[in-house]
Amino acid sequence: EGVVLDLLAHAHRRAHVDHDHERAMVALVRAMEACAQRQLFKQYKIKTWDVQPEQLPDAMRDTCRTCYLDDVDGKYKLPLQSQFRVLAGLGDQMGQAFLRDWPKMKPLFDAANHAVLGHGFEAIKAERVQQLSDVVMKLTGVSESSLPKFPNLNL
């Protein structure tokens, strides 16, 4: 949970202090992934970077075997959206919430992917960062007041 809080706090600093929307967006996406990874490992002992297909819900096993095999190290690796699909398939509330909210989130993830720090050349708008931040905070159950803050030094 500490990593998720740190990533969310980092995203908020990038957005509100530095006005660096690209880095804020990257940190928000990573916070979501870290949250899914934590839940998968803590609750189900699933490592997203070394998945055993037998650990997954039946409906996802064939997809894992055909789509997620790393040809270099021979390990199955789940991408972000699939991590939440697995959680949902296992009956996890966070995974189910992700799937329910996916239609609202997809344009935000697309914006992150089309940004320079993603895979494209488009600028990130501040409102997109705020929208994704709102979604991530809701999905993770984190309140802004629980985010770590740096102390103010009066020098």
Question: Model regions: which residues?
Answer:
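TPR-adjacent "capping" and linker segments in tetratricopeptide-repeat scaffold/adaptor proteins
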Residues: 1-2, 100
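Amphipathic alpha-helical interface elements
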Residues: 2-86, 151-152
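Charge-enriched, short contiguous segments at helix-coil
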Residues: 91-155
